[in-house]
Amino acid sequence: MSFFFRYRALLVLLTVLPLSGCLFRSRKVVQPVDTVQLKTATQQELIDYINTQASKIQSAQATVDIDTTVGGVKKGKVTDYQEIRGYLLLRKPAMLRLIGLMPIVRNKAFDMVSDGQRFKLWIPSKSRFVMGRNDVETRNPSQPLESLRPQYIYDSLLLRQIDPQNEIAVMENDTELVTEVKSHKISRADYVIDVVRKGPQGWVLARKIVFSRTDLLPHRQLIYDGDGNVTTNAVYEKYKEENGVNFPWQIEIAMPQQEYDITLNIVKLELNEPLPDDKFVLEQPPGADVVDLDKREAHSQPAPATDK
């Protein structure tokens, strides 16, 4: 046999062998099957749900268990604090009070109040009284509680109505990984309502509200600042109906910029009971070490240039 014919035969053999299955193997890729019956809704139905539920709540008072975690990549460590009992008061349009109690003895661990613009924080164990505007940020690793702003909690607890004058809401179909029995993760479809708000510099993403398609209830809310950064990531679980309102009895509020995570487990809840103004008054205790964050911020600003 000539060299040419031997070469051609070898070439044909090398071409045919992979097709015969001798040089490769295949295996099945199993897609985890979601056996849960999924519900459907339109964009307008989800928007109407948000607005209707928000309009039904004017005030709330609750006994809660407070679970707190502080830290992350920025701090280089994560600290889990012992769960404590507390009391939560809310009143529209922006009033909030959160009181935490020490374990066993039930003395106050902290007392925090806000009117939506300014806040006050009393930490009895350190005789420290902090006050300032809600938008003043602090970075005090030795006092992580001072980084917590009541407004973050308020905005996460109560879904705000969508303002048709200044906001646009659109729906997207998405999926999330959920853990089923035996720790198997499956991909489950959900609905996301993106709320875009008109700002001074144009339109910005304000919120993402994620609805589970197993029950068509909001199970997550992402709130963004004007630069597109997530300020709070709230997760809602264990819904119960209270006075015609579906309200989550477990709320986890993560604040990634502050590396502060607080979970509220509701023990007792009352909605739309009268809450007078004096319920949101926090007086400065005598002899307290006062920290005015507004003055601290003013002192940290460089002095304006003057003409010589």
Question: Which residues does each PLM region occupy?
Answer:
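Sec-dependent bacterial lipoprotein signal peptides
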Residues: 1-22
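N-terminal leader/targeting segments and the immediate start of mature chains
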Residues: 22-83, 147, 295-308
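Gly/Pro-enriched, hydrophobic low-complexity segments
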Residues: 23-24, 169-287, 291
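An acidic-aromatic
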Residues: 24, 93-155, 288
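Flexible, processing/modification-adjacent segments and terminal tails
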Residues: 41-44, 123-205, 284
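Extended lipid/amphipathic-ligand handling interfaces
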Residues: 49, 85-90, 112, 234-241
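A mature extracytoplasmic/lumenal domain signature
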Residues: 64-66, 92-94, 100-104, 116, ...
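Post-signal peptide N-terminal segment of secreted/secretory-pathway proteins
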Residues: 66-110
